[in-house]
Amino acid sequence: MLTGNEVWVKVQQSLRGNLSKPSYETWISPTTFCNFERGELTLLAANDFSSAWLTNNYSRAIEEAAEAVIGESVKVIVKVKDDIQKSEASLPPRISIPAFHPPGDSKKTDSKPALNLRYVFNRFVVGPNSRIAHAAAMSVAEAPAKEFNPLFICGGVGLGKTHLMQAIGHYRLEIDPGAKVSYVSTETFTNDLIVAIRQDGMQSFRDKYRAADLILVDDIQFLEGKEYTQEEFFHTFNALHESGTQIVLASDRPPNQIPRLQERLISRFSMGLIADVQAPDLETRMAILQKKAEQDRVRLPRDLIQFIAGRFTLNIRELEGALTRAVAFASITGLPMTVESIAPMLDPNGQGVEVTPKQVMEKVSEVFAVTSDEMCSSSRRRPVSQARQVGMYLMRHGTDLSLPRIGEVFGGKDHTTVMYAIEQIEKKLSTDPQLASQVQKVKDLLQIDSRRKR
């Protein structure tokens, strides 16, 4: 029987043959074995960033390689070398909330979804854009159902609504570990309702949602047009409010701007406090970057912080994503963390990057886990066709190839097929966050590859 370290050696050998040489040498080779127990393979990365990158981008490939070696399911955990105890001690304890299981489902294990460990008040940067929402969140966390009930937090994507909501939950459970805190998305509420109806479990559904001491409901705008869900939510809201339960709701817009929302729900959502979260100003964006850099133990020069904060203005998620990409770029290329070095990577349009069709194919293949041969084939499997379309889109925007020439690269496809692919990706980028993230990842890899070869 192989030891854990021997398993990792064989996994590395497998990945060396499946990944590009730069990817293997940058991420897999420096990673060391820590422990293998009860199906969990624990690895050690050099720093916080490497740990996060491995987890987000290579954990599935490692798990598949390990499963091929030992013939059993494997879960990969990546920790930080020489800093495990410190990093674990710096985080608050994981807080679990019981999951809903309808009648007849008792054989299923409780999956215990948890509040995000990072969404606590001391990690939230307060600025003029969020001062009222933050103060209101603190108020209901300290004294639920006393002043603002419900608390309705609204604002655009990535501005911190979910962070504030979950921070309230963490705070309450820290004060009262026995409190019944329920954090749920509107989609989950709807899905639970559908399951309860199908399995004749409405009483269990109501008991589950109405037993909470504090209920946090995210993305309430998705109640739009769901008449039966709105009906049930109305009665749930009333029962909770009358029993003195604190209700916190979050939406991308105020109640009166949610289309096809019942007037009685609009009235109830508006009876407490509506706290708006706006996009952060320059000073707040700089403070957010500085705080994240400190949390990740990364030293950033002030002019680089100001450059990133001035370039990414829409929301916090975009801002922090830019910082993550900048740190990755500097880490992989070995370039200093300066505006001059980082600016090309943060060009949202990828301008100034010269790439070849071969590079595009390699990076798309790496990110989408589809081979170049598959992309050049006539396969219509969704993973293959999507990777092919992304490749065509990136070749159009990153090389000087004509549409017919791009079609030739992809196995002799017609130029109209290339045009259609480009149009499809351009449409999906604004509506499919996962695809947008994958495309951005390919662009980042192309940036890194391009700079390496200069």
Swiss-Prot record:
Region (Domain IV, binds dsDNA) residue spans: 331-454
Similarity section: Belongs to the DnaA family.
Protein's organism: Prochlorococcus marinus (strain MIT 9211)
Signal peptide annotation: none
Keyword DNA-binding in annotation: yes
Any one GO MF annotation of this record: DNA replication origin binding
Main location (coarse class): cytoplasm
Region (Domain II): 84-113
InterPro entries according to UniProt: AAA+_ATPase (IPR003593), Chromosome_initiator_DnaA (IPR001957), Chromosome_initiator_DnaA-like (IPR020591), Chromosome_initiator_DnaA_CS (IPR018312), DnaA_C (IPR013159), DnaA_dom (IPR013317), DnaA_N_dom (IPR024633), DnaA_N_sf (IPR038454)
Protein name: Chromosomal replication initiator protein DnaA
One Pfam family per UniProt: Bac_DnaA
Any GO CC annotation of this UniProt entry: cytoplasm
